[in-house]
Amino acid sequence: RRVLFRSVCNRTIKKHTVSKLYTEVNTIPSNNVGLLLGTSPKLKSGNNNLYFDYRILATVELYKAGKIKYILISGDNRKEDYNEPEEMKKALMQKGIPEKSIYLDYAGFRTLDSVVRAKEVFGQNRLTIISQRFHNERAIYLAEKNGIDAIGYNAQNVNAYAGLKTNIRELLARVKMFIDLGMDKQPHFLGEKI
């Protein structure tokens, strides 16, 4: 039963999001805001996190092509020495993105938080979500269920061997997402509108 439920969750998400995913900058529609989903620049081993690097490159590509005007970086900063939004902001600025085009959401602890807060706190009803395809699929599905018109720009993925742990984690995250939606789970912090 568990395997069947995981399979149904996975197929449902893929079916509902396939037409909203883009890999080519010249074919993606423009939106004012790109929601960049956070991750750490380094792995626990100390090596560079390719998920981070590829998301930064995808965001720069969209911005420089005029497909987004502003970037909302949503990520975790619960620990003093761990700040996904600030690290991503630094990386974007090093690639020539002006600071005035970057906004930070420090309470994007989970994809649910990032997506819902983009609407409820930052007032966005239309978004281009930027992450790897597997993550974009889930984020777009969450956006739809929360009344947000979202498309996704797929950053390059990490090779299957390096991303095996992430892919397994993603299958479980999809199941949890359906449970959260069924229970009307809200972000950890909602806060005042900005």
Spans of features found by a protein language model:
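Short, small-residue-biased leader/transition segments that mark boundaries at the very start
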Residues: 3-4
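Short linear elements at protein peripheries
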Residues: 185-194
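A structural signal for short, hydrophobic/glycine-enriched beta-strand patches
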Residues: 11-167
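A transmembrane-helix-recognition feature enriched in membrane-embedded lipid enzymes
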Residues: 164-186
